Amino acid sequence: MLFKTHDLKDWQVEILTKFILEAGEEPRIERVGKVLEKEEGVRMEEVSGYLILLQKNAIKSLIKLLAERKKTKTRRLLCDALSEVGKNAIDLFTPFLEDSRWFLVRNIIYILGRIGKEEALPYVQRALTHEEVRVRREGIQALGLIGGSKASGMLVKALTDEDPRIRAMSAINLGKTGRKASLLPLLEVVQSKEFPKKGSDEIRAFFEAIGMVGSNEAIPVLQQLLEKKSWFARGKADEIRIGAANAMAMIGTPEAREILDAGRASKDEALQDACLQALRRKASKEPTV
């Protein structure tokens, strides 16, 4: 409860608790739904402030309301409120993961991600095999928010998903963890024979993820890709070269900088361009004094 109940007398706390519990009963939640339907003249921040005061007895009714609402703004408000109300009640959300409405399942995964507790991981993992790709994508985002070694392990498995966007999202979320344990699977992918066949967005995501980890351990592989002569079409080879250079610039250590400076002075035009681009990009993102 968000109120400072230590400032109140016992009888006041009892009345206040009873009021909040009654506010979470289904008829009251239905009234909130009718208010939200109007939208015009409704102060959403006030509705949100009211909802986050509710207790876990309101969760099922709020989820029912969430399933019925069509407007994105309203659904987001309900999801965010449920993320607060349900912090210690994950078990009340999990039955809805079996719902036939994919959009509701996606919303439940969104909520579990924002609650951010490791105990939700087995349920988020189930979302990674859902037939609807949008549910799987939400599962990847949730893993990134929950974090930890178990979530990272699930993200590694998702690097081989059939959907390229999910593979890219998995890579980025692995990079955000900054864990060296995440680096090896990322490096394995960029060195694979299949990697040059991937789309531009996916290639860029993997190199960005490697750069996020920020470890010198990536430098030998990145240097090899940066300086490699390729039999692939020039455009694809340049994409990989630029990606490797950008990752090196993100790592930003003296060792990485030395390789980029050497590449900038190279007579190989493609190598020179990649290193120059990476250094300029790095400089543009650095704060000015």
What are these regions (language model features)?
Residues 1-2, 14, 25-36, 56-67, ...:
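Amphipathic alpha-helical scaffolding segments comprising HEAT/armadillo-like alpha-solenoid repeats
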Residues 1-12, 36-39, 68, 201, ...:
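HEAT-repeat alpha-solenoid elements in large eukaryotic scaffold proteins
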Residues 13, 43-44, 75, 105, ...:
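Residue-level detector of extended alpha-helical repeat arrays and alpha-solenoid scaffolds
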Residues 16, 46-47, 78, 108, ...:
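Conserved hydrophobic register position within alpha-solenoid helical repeats
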Residues 39-40, 70-71, 100-102, 131-132, ...:
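Short inter-helical turns and helix N-cap capping residues of alpha-solenoid HEAT/ARM repeat scaffolds
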Residues 54-58, 77, 85-89, 106-107, ...:
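Alpha-solenoid helical repeat scaffolds
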